[in-house]
Amino acid sequence: MIQLDSPRSVSSFLQRLGRTGRRAGSVRNALFLATDNDTLLRAAGLLHLWGTGFVEPVVPPPSPRHIAAQQLLALALQEGRFARASWHEWWAGSHVMDGADEVLDYLVEQEFLAADGPWLFIGPRAEKEFGRRHFLELLSTFIADLEMKVIEGRREIGSIAPLSLTAQVIESRKPLLLAGRAWTVESIDWDRRVVAVREDLTKGRVRWGSEPMPESFEMVRARRDVLLGADPPVRLSQRAVARLAEVRTLRRDQVVEDGLVMDRSEKLSVLWAFGGLKAHATLLAALPDEVSESATADNETIRFDLHFEADLLDGLSLEGVLPAIAPQAVDGLKFSVALPRGVAAATLGERFVDRLGAGRLTRAQVQVE
């Protein structure tokens, strides 16, 4: 198996590795070809994490309220009608339907379901929203991860998560960092999940880029371990050994053994937290609005205003906080139209929360450079 650059998870790597070595007399094999310093470090981090025996746990998305709405509508479509008082019997205690009473009330209130005495059946709003092609969309619950495609003209730049589209980025007050460059957002089509951008030539190239799609806390921490000297348990080419040493030298000021580094420049403070985008966004959600609204994050860093005080992170309460998601991003969540707007926003926000990772960051010592 030849891998250009690196997957975003150990499980993805294992899935690809498992396709090799199937013939008699052959062994599993993989060759990683990194195209630049960032992807070399990412590949080394992945293989270091794999060498520890770590594999991402299989965890279902939390609070799938939009799926509960789909299931109730599909039941009405399947049976023609169902009794409002006994709908629970159809799912035998499935956790997917936890909290579905609130969803059911909304479906009836908004005429997705119509009532006739104790019975519920498909209503006019459901026919309008989902009735095309004999309710084909309603019959499928397969949902891909919510990603936004970024384009410049007809050229595709890459993909990002909704977490990257903060209010300041959407309003073009701050650039979107992607593919080693800064971009100004021109328009967003939330239904098609497309972000149109133009390059911000005043910013130049971004020196240190991070994958804009969320990576796990463990994956990003593995890169930090490599910068601190850990080597992946694989055979490296001479060029890879030399380049990895160069990367460690170039980025030695971004990591310390027993804490985090805060790098202050003339215009901003950059916290090299290496916690992953979800943990960083969760941390920002717990900070005061006047701090978080001007901050941006990626998988490796959180960028604050120049005068940010690291003491604000000490003992920060993360209970109940959800990462800030652009309200329009809810439109990209399948079946979200069948949920109250606030419930749909919370459903999406809970997919991007990482309180465990954020909690580890609040307990770390911060070294200010």
Segment roles from a protein language model:
Residues 6-61:
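Conserved segment of the helicase C-terminal RecA-like domain
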Residues 1:
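Hydrophobic beta-strand segment of the Class I
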